Amino acid sequence: MNSKIKVDKFVIVAFLLCMVCTMAMQAKAYDNFKVSVYVRAYEVDKMKDIHWLDSTWNVISQQLEVDKIYLETHRDLLIVDDATLEQAKKFFHDRGIETAGGITYTINEANSFETFCYSNPEHREMVRKIAEHTAKHFDEFILDDFFFTSCKSDIEIKAKGAQSWTEYRLKLMTEAGRDLVLKPAKKVNPRVKVIIKYPNWYDHFQGLGFNLEEGPQLFDGVWTGTETRDPAGNQHLQNYLSYNIIRYFDNRRPGYNGGGWVDSGGLKLGMDRYAEQLHLTMLAKAPEIILFAYNQLLGVKLSPRFRTPWQGMGTSFNYDEMTAPIRQKDGTSIEPTTMARIADVVLKQTDKLIGKLVNPIGIKSYKPFHVAGDDFLQNYLGMIGLPMDIRPVFPKDQQVV
């Protein structure tokens, strides 16, 4: 009897220790949202070398607390093999990090963002196989915002017929999403959740086939590109878009907008331009932020050139404080080396504020599907201090629209 009691006690103690370890591994780094990192297929492919994976992850994780990793399976015709994907998944799971998949449907991004031709039978077969390959490894994956087509091959010209390019591409990409991505993926893995990321060009979605009328209802969720980068760049995006476009997709299909997405674009304006994009994304109450990408968080080194002239004048972004030594949990300190440190400090600042805020409100602004003209008007209104709230359906219950 005594031996049985001892065994039972041992089992209980072991169980409790496992529970404590699990809770510790699953402890949230942030109270009000998740922070995730997207890894391009180029870097995922390098993760076949476990030493490279471990050493690079140490650089990032010592500076930035991460809840989730998106492992891309395809980009520019590079398909990451099964063994590498499983090794990478296990590596992150062992460290308490969630994993999901990602796909970028490009043939050659460097060649003017060359995409697939979705009426070409060979291309269609590749698109289908990539979706199946990804669904085999993940219960969730996201399509990076290259799920569009700019192809004008002979096949596409013939298939278009008398339609305009916009009409043709809207129908084509809706069909491709349904028949080449969703159906094949769910046949391989009925549990899989497929999310489409929409880019930051909301006034021009329709021209290359992003169908805002049907797409958000077709996919299991949407993601929002909140990258505003340099306002003087070729897109001429105003800073307010990082907030405004989150609200637009929240209103398009409430409860299905997974979050925002920011990269390192615009750093020539200073590191606080990056910080502002993070702040504005989260102030829109995004439930998750994806930081693009692993290679940038690893490779963009902290430098005095990112310190703007107005530092030291009482601004909320203090470059010197953010680049000070980081105290680790074991009491040691390390010198921050990359932009991962900036993301960590900024997001933790924002996290403290977000919990005190209610849901955003603003002046309702009606934007019908597939319209052109008055490019990004709502962003300009936001920049002069008017709180905007874009709606895809006319808000009949409002006195002011």
PLM segments and residue spans:
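A short, well-structured beta->alpha microelement
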Residues: 50-58, 377-399
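Hydrophobic targeting/anchoring helices
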Residues: 38, 67, 111-115, 139, ...
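Bacterial N-terminal signal peptides
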Residues: 11-22
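Active-site-adjacent "subsite" loops/lids of carbohydrate-active enzymes
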Residues: 30-54, 85-93, 98-139, 145, ...
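Short, acidic/polar
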Residues: 45-63, 120-134, 204-215, 270-281
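Surface-exposed amphipathic alpha-helices with a cationic face
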Residues: 31, 86-100, 177-192, 246-257
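Bacterial N-terminal signal peptides that target proteins for export
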Residues: 2-13
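Bacterial Sec-dependent signal peptides at the C-terminal "C-region" and cleavage site
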Residues: 21-31
